[in-house]
């Protein structure tokens, strides 16, 4: 019998979230971001749920080739652009758009011999200080690209560093507009947080938006807003079963380091999921779970293959009971709305992005899709 743990990918939830992004940024085209193997969900698994996207944005040439082989004929954008000159031949062969964020990438284009001119997104650094030309160097980069016969179309982009917080996007927007107002080309600025919080403004959403984490049902500005606030549905759920029950007396301890001490008689469920499955090792006592659809909590430290949960006040919970680590229970008859991955991530001092992308290969995955 397989170990009783399972991840579920819900394509209807993915379609719903994509529709929410389109509604939040009316008239804009959508790059669905599928980097990091679609945030841990699996490129092959999610592609059918993203057919309504206008383009796919990712990092790796190998991933671009995979989605072409899977039948995607729409635009594909390489978010970090080319790393070597020979990558440009792949871009031509696979008909890829690619980001240009430094002079070295323009140098590569200038010496590249191609029969098909390239479509590029020229990136400005408006304060994130990761990739992109400084505002002062941006026009010279655009002018140089515009003079190359290897380049057919230049679009303009940046990435907001504070769209999810109080600082907001106004300073970055002002910089971008000041240095691009008379340059031709489509624009792309908005990540998930900017789409949900700011994209009703046509000057912000411009031509293309690039939602990532929100597509998969996580709130980009948690804890300020929950996924439910943005009407997002969890795409990934992680469920496992209780494989043993322990009865504790006052003073008994649980797990490595005796980190949890019972202050009353307790029943503890041992769950077939640990940090080797992708559950966060640093999740403390009190991290929320659902047991047979009823909210409870973890107790003690997370082990490699197991976690322990409090079932003292759940008299029907026993060996075989389903524990929802994040997302929704597998049985729709269960009473709970589940556990947001953002709640678990916040308790563990991380973000939903990390939990999704860290799902271990040993966890079996089931794809749900309604006709």
Give the location of each predicted region.
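Conserved beta-strand positions in the central sheet of alpha/beta enzyme cores
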Residues: 57-58, 77-80, 99-100, 157, ...
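Active-site loop/helix belt of alpha/beta enzymes
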Residues: 2-3, 24, 36-48, 92-94, ...
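Short, acidic/turn-prone active-site loops that include or flank metal/cofactor-
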Residues: 61-62, 80-84, 103-106, 125-126, ...
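A structural signal for short, hydrophobic beta-strand segments that form beta-sheets
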Residues: 80, 153, 242, 298-299
């Amino acid at each position: 019998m397989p170990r009783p743990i399972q991840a579920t990918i819900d394509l209807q939830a993915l379609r719903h979230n994509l529709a929410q992004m389109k509604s939040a940024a009316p008239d804009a085209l959508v790059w669905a971001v599928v980097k990091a193997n679609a945030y841990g969900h699996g490129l092959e698994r999610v592609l059918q749920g993203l057919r309504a996207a206008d383009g796919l944005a990712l990092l790796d040439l190998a991933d671009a080739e995979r989605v072409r082989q899977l039948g995607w004929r729409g635009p594909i954008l390489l978010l970090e652009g080319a790393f070597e000159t020979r990558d440009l031949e792949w871009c031509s062969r696979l008909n890829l758009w690619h980001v240009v964020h430094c002079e070295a990438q323009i140098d590569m284009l200038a010496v590249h011999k191609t029969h098909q001119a390239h479509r590029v997104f020229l990136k400005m650094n408006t304060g994130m200080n990761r990739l992109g030309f400084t505002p002062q160097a941006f026009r010279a980069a655009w002018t140089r690209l515009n003079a190359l016969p290897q380049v057919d179309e230049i679009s303009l982009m940046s990435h907001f560093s504070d769209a999810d917080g109080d600082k907001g996007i106004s300073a970055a927007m002002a910089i971008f507009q000041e240095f691009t107002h008379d340059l031709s080309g489509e624009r792309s600025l908005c990540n998930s947080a900017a789409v949900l919080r700011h994209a009703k403004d046509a000057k912000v959403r411009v031509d293309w938006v690039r939602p990532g984490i929100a597509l998969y049902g996580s709130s980009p500005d948690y804890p300020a807003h929950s996924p439910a606030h943005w009407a997002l549905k969890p795409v990934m759920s992680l469920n496992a079963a209780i494989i043993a029950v322990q009865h504790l007396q006052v003073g008994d301890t649980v797990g490595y380091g005796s980190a949890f001490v019972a202050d009353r008689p307790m029943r503890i469920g041992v769950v077939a999921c640990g940090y080797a499955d992708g559950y966060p090792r640093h999740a403390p006592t009190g991290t929320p779970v659902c047991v047979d659809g009823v909210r409870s909590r973890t107790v003690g430290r997370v082990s490699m293959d197991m976690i322990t949960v409090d079932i003292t006040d759940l008299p029907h919970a026993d060996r075989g009971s389903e524990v929802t680590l994040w997302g929704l229970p597998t049985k729709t008859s269960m009473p709970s709305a589940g556990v947001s991955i953002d709640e678990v991530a916040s308790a563990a001092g991380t973000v939903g992005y990390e939990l999704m992308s860290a799902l271990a290969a040993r966890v079996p995955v089931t794809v749900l899709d309604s006709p």
